[in-house]
């Protein structure tokens, strides 16, 4: 098995468009996932080096531009109106505040600015304000990303015309396990939004969360779904659940660190040209665990003290870790 992977690791030669013949299956992905840990990381590092500078990390900053009051019942989220998290709903943030925070993000080394709103989908009355945020943030010299819930084709086109670079809409988990986590929005709804985003010419950011109570096969199957999209996401965020007080999953069991690193490696092997982002949960990861994730192919992180409503490693810790690992921040010229 190892010799086969070394000579032609499934995924390395894949192009953006795939046929049914070379589509991933749970069985083919599981074969890689089950490799001895050292072999899996060796293969992932080889694929990573073939597609990226292994010592550069893309830095993004995430800002919550509208907090709480979301009508969705996502079991992991403190911003859901279904959960007694104590989080107060806010109105849409002003453009001036968004731009002030965007400039701080750029000054900290971020090349992409991600703006998230706790909505099921944007309301028509908010679309002009969102479009203006995109235009003004781009004018600062940053890539833009939005995560606003479901989008219609017209909404995706509106934001594309404003210059939106990326749209984040995670599929969260496997199609099989999805109804155990969310009941107010279907798995197909999520895939439909991703299709609208792609058709509008916006780059796709989509990944999932580990630690929801899913099985290993669910985690792998989530990656199969993403890798088998007509064009895989340009950005694949992999989150480790942060159990939020008041949420339905506040007592969820922690994720095994080795299993988490395996998923990072598998994402790299299955989507070799995508940025794999080490996302939520880094604050509770040891430096050693993060180092393994970078070796396994993660090459993007969110910087800043907070990630929506959860804690994130501060700038000092990230700077120290990157210095000790010999990693440098990516620039737009390097990853555009």
UniProtKB/Swiss-Prot annotation:
Catalytic activity: (4R,5S)-dethiobiotin + (sulfur carrier)-SH + 2 reduced [2Fe-2S]-[ferredoxin] + 2 S-adenosyl-L-methionine = (sulfur carrier)-H + biotin + 2 5'-deoxyadenosine + 2 L-methionine + 2 oxidized [2Fe-2S]-[ferredoxin]
Occurrences of domain Radical SAM core (ranges): 55-282
UniProt xrefs under SMART domains: BATS, Elp3
UniProt source species: Brucella anthropi (strain ATCC 49188 / DSM 6882 / CCUG 24695 / JCM 21032 / LMG 3331 / NBRC 15819 / NCTC 12168 / Alc 37) (Ochrobactrum anthropi)
Protein name per its UniProtKB record: Biotin synthase
CDD domains assigned: Radical_SAM
Lineage: superkingdom: Bacteria
Pfam assignment, any one: Radical_SAM
This protein's pathway: Cofactor biosynthesis; biotin biosynthesis; biotin from 7,8-diaminononanoate: step 2/2
Amino acids binding [2Fe-2S] cluster: 114, 145, 205, 277
Residues binding [4Fe-4S] cluster: 70, 74, 77
UniProt keyword list: 2Fe-2S, 4Fe-4S, Biotin biosynthesis, Iron, Iron-sulfur, Metal-binding, S-adenosyl-L-methionine, Transferase
